[in-house]
Amino acid sequence: MLAVFEKAIGNPPEELKLPSMGLETMKSRQDIVEIVRSLWPDSTVYSLANGNYMASSQENESPSQPRSTVVTDDIFCIITGALENKTVLRRHYGLPRQATDAMVIVEAYKVLRDRAPYPSDQVIKDLEGKFAFILFDARSGTIIIARDREGCIELHWGITGDGSLVCCNDLNITGEACGKSCAPFPPGCIFMNGSGLKSFDHPLYKVRAIAREDDNGLICGVMFQVDLYTRLPSIPRTGSAANWAENAAVPGEENI
């Protein structure tokens, strides 16, 4: 699965640009499409507004890591892996037995977007299994990216030369598109383009970028992890208007 969004809508963490090597290898969004088509010849590319797009492929799919894609009501969702509590979630959201993992996630998003009074991380925490997914609501411009807490499903993200956000489960594509300006998407975390990156197991604590240096002292990569010593000023846990479609940044998280 792949998603590429321009800087204005993707709002990627600035720390992804820290690596000082490989900047010359960054590709344009159109270049990335050609890379995808060469590596995933059977891929389906979903063209979005302003040159943004998502893509899915069944290349190297396995029973342990199935893939599911759904497009409905201008909401695009691609998931790799499986929700172990899918039966419970189907029943909770009133979905038929045929509903796929991607359908379950979209329904959860729609219900929370329209009615929920509790934070998004609380809902992601209820998802059990080995999974990584990307969701985009074309009407609201909302992007949601999440990965299971064990990091069982491969997922990487990066930033291109023009500041576009790239997220993909294939390191070859992310690396070729972003050079050194890419990193593993942190396990147990959710990213929303309106509010940034947070841990759904430790939502009260900041997620920080940590730079890696080579033997010459140059930054060659970054990784993101929860800083259990830095507590966020406040996150409403109940009775809040915050939900998956929120666009207000949490104080203290603007630069994540």
Task: State where each predicted segment sits.
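Cysteine-centered catalytic environments shared across enzyme families
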Residues: 1-256
